[in-house]
């Protein structure tokens, strides 16, 4: 009996394997690809070919695609687009040339500017004819000179302000009293008179206390307490009948220029003047009469 065509050894082995075991053996990749293409319509032959490529081949394809995109991006721009580009030269506006005036022309214009900063149309026309320029140029010159004049005035005002501040400060310092000297001389705790004064000013007393001031001025110079002593803070002040010492307060605070001052007459004078002038009791009686 003639034998059939001989099969490949692998096929013979596969045919001898039972059906159950054959179903468990994985199929070849080609058959799997064909089955996947038939089942999923989204899979294209190009994608299957790319997936079957090795990693170096994929990298080469990606580099080629990137190079082509770069070449397309670096294509020369059209002339129309180049003309629309804005460069530093294109952004500059067209500027007219400045009109240059001679010294005589400037002198003439300055003379008319000093007379009138806002000339009328007739005056502008006359100046344009005499100078040899257009009316617009004359208007521009007057406009620029007015702005320059305002700037100069503003600078002069700013320079004058510090000087005026210095003068006012000097005046305030000259009128500001360096301190006040409250002097209290009392008998049994009663104040005699009060007032305010500085080194460069006379004492300021209330109207009800002017009579006591006149009493102080009328007394003898040896027995009275001189104003210089009070200003220096060395006034010898004592009490009269009770023998108690008077409270003398000397305030040197510069900020308090109008502090109340209680001025009293000193009962005890230097020892060499005890015998001259009225006694302390007589002076005390006069002060009480004035009140």
From Swiss-Prot:
DNA-binding region(s), residue ranges: 94-153
Consequences of knocking out this gene: No visible phenotype; mice are viable and fertile. Female mice lacking maternally transcribed Obox1, Obox2, Obox5, Obox7 as well as zygotically expressed Obox3 and Obox4 are infertile: embryos arrest at two-four cell stage due to impaired zygotic genome activation (ZGA).
InterPro entries according to UniProt: Distal-less_Homeobox_TF (IPR050460), HD (IPR001356), Homeobox_CS (IPR017970), Homeodomain-like_sf (IPR009057)
GO cellular component: nucleus
Localization (cell): Nucleus
Molecular function per GO: DNA binding; DNA-binding transcription factor activity, RNA polymerase II-specific
Consequence the record notes for mutating residue 98 to E: Abolished DNA-binding
GO biological process: maternal-to-zygotic transition of gene expression
Keyword list, A-Z: Developmental protein, DNA-binding, Homeobox, Nucleus, Transcription, Transcription regulation
Feature: compositional bias, Low complexity: 62-74
Main location per the UniProt record: nucleus
SMART domains tied to this protein: HOX
Composition bias, Polar residues: 41-54
Name of the protein described by the UniProt record: Oocyte-specific homeobox protein 5
Similarity field: Belongs to the paired homeobox family. Obox subfamily.
Region annotation (Disordered) ranges: 41-97
Expression sites (tissue/organ): Specifically expressed in oocytes and early embryos.
Physiological role: Transcription factor required for zygotic genome activation (ZGA), a critical event in early embryonic development during which the developmental control passes from maternally provided mRNAs to the expression of the zygotic genome after fertilization. Together with other Obox family members, required in early two-cell stage embryos to kick-start the major ZGA wave by facilitating RNA Polymerase II 'pre-configuration', during which RNA Polymerase II relocates from the initial one-cell stage binding targets to ZGA gene promoters and distal enhancers.
């Amino acid at each position: 009996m003639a034998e059939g065509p001989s099969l490949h050894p692998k096929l013979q082995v596969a045919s001898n394997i039972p059906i159950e075991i054959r179903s468990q053996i994985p199929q070849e990749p080609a058959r799997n690809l064909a089955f996947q293409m038939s089942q999923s319509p989204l899979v294209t032959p190009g994608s299957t070919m790319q997936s079957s490529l090795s990693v170096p081949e994929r990298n080469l394809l990606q580099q080629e695609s990137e190079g082509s995109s770069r070449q397309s991006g670096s294509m020369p721009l059209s002339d129309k687009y180049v003309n629309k580009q804005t460069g530093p030269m294109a952004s500059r506006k067209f500027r007219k040339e400045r009109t240059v005036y001679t010294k005589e022309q400037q002198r003439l214009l300055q003379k008319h500017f000093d007379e009138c900063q806002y000339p009328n149309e007739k005056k502008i026309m006359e100046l344009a004819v005499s100078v040899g320029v257009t009316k617009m140029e004359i208007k521009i010159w007057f406009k620029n000179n007015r702005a320059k004049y305002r700037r100069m005035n503003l600078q002069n005002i700013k320079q004058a302000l510090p000087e005026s501040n210095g003068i006012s400060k000097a005046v305030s310092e000259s009128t500001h009293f360096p301190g006040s000297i409250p002097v209290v001389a009392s008998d049994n705790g009663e104040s005699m008179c009060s007032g305010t004064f500085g080194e460069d000013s006379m004492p300021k007393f209330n109207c009800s206390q002017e009579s006591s001031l006149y009493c102080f001025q009328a007394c003898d110079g040896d027995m009275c307490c001189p104003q210089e002593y009070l200003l220096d803070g060395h006034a010898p002040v004592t009490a009269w009948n009770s023998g108690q010492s008077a409270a003398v307060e000397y305030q040197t605070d510069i900020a308090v220029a109008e502090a109340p001052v209680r001025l009293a007459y000193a009962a005890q004078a230097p020892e060499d003047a005890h015998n001259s002038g009225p006694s302390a009791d007589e002076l005390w009686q006069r002060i009480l009469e004035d009140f």
